[in-house]
């Protein structure tokens, strides 16, 4: 009982409730649209595993990551996994992004995001008084660029964008000056234009265009977004009830 009281004394209840509500809403959505509930059952199992993993990971004091090599080792391990997937990974939906293990498929880009957050948090926390110096933004950007490039060449443009967003968000809250922020935004815009011109494939450009204007091609690239809009709108405020959505039951989604 003492351990339980100690554990929950520092528990972030808001974060736990938010994550629980998001998870439950996802399960309800999956249960309502799927005729085959095998995916729903698998998701429940993985959710239970995730909760157990969260509890175990939250027991040690996270501040040990601030001292010692743990943060950098996590970062280095993520890079090695990304290099490994480029050599022996299986191709799924056009991207060589997964390592097939005997009981599940590992996507190294996911733990790489967590490792990047940890190493950047350690870097910024040790230099919070010097963050106004642009060199720290460049060094943190180099940490990010290595993972970004390894993920981008898989090619997994979606995960690469999330990795960039992690870095940009952490730089933004670290106390960056407006002048440096404007410079970062400008460099980001130039990098995006360069990627658009020489690196992005046609289907990746199509996804970006569809995200910006999902209704421009209702029968093509924007089909799912259009049908989702109908599904949400047809339910109005109270919804149609679990299992009674027309777009899901008639297999428009």
What are these regions (language model features)?
Residues 1-19:
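N-terminal membrane topogenic signal
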Residues 16-24, 28-226:
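Hydrophobic alpha-helical transmembrane segments of multi-pass inner membrane proteins, especially
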């Amino acid at each position: 009982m003492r351990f339980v009281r100690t554990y929950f004394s520092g528990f972030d209840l808001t974060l736990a409730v938010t994550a629980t509500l998001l998870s439950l809403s996802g399960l309800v959505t999956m249960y309502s649209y799927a005729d085959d509930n095998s995916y729903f059952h698998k998701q429940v199992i993985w959710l239970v595993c995730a909760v157990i993993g969260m509890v175990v990971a939250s027991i040690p004091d996270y501040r040990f990551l601030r001292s010692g090599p743990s943060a950098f080792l996590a970062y280095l391990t993520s890079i090695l996994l990304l290099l490994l997937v480029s050599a022996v990974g299986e191709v799924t939906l056009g991207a060589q992004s997964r390592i097939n293990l005997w009981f599940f498929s590992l996507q190294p880009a996911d733990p790489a995001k967590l490792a990047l957050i940890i190493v950047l948090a350690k870097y910024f926390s040790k230099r919070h008084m010097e963050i106004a110096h642009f060199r720290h933004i460049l060094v943190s950007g180099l940490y990010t660029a290595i993972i970004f490039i390894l993920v981008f060449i898989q090619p997994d443009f979606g995960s690469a964008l999330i990795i960039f967003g992690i870095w940009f968000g952490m730089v933004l809250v670290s106390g960056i000056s407006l002048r440096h922020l404007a410079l970062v935004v400008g460099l980001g815009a130039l990098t995006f234009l360069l990627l658009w011109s020489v690196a992005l494939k046609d289907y990746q450009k199509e996804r970006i265009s569809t995200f910006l204007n999902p209704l421009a091609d209702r029968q093509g690239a924007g089909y799912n977004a259009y049908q989702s809009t109908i599904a949400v709108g047809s339910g109005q405020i109270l919804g149609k009830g679990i299992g009674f959505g027309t777009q899901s039951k008639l297999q428009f989604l």
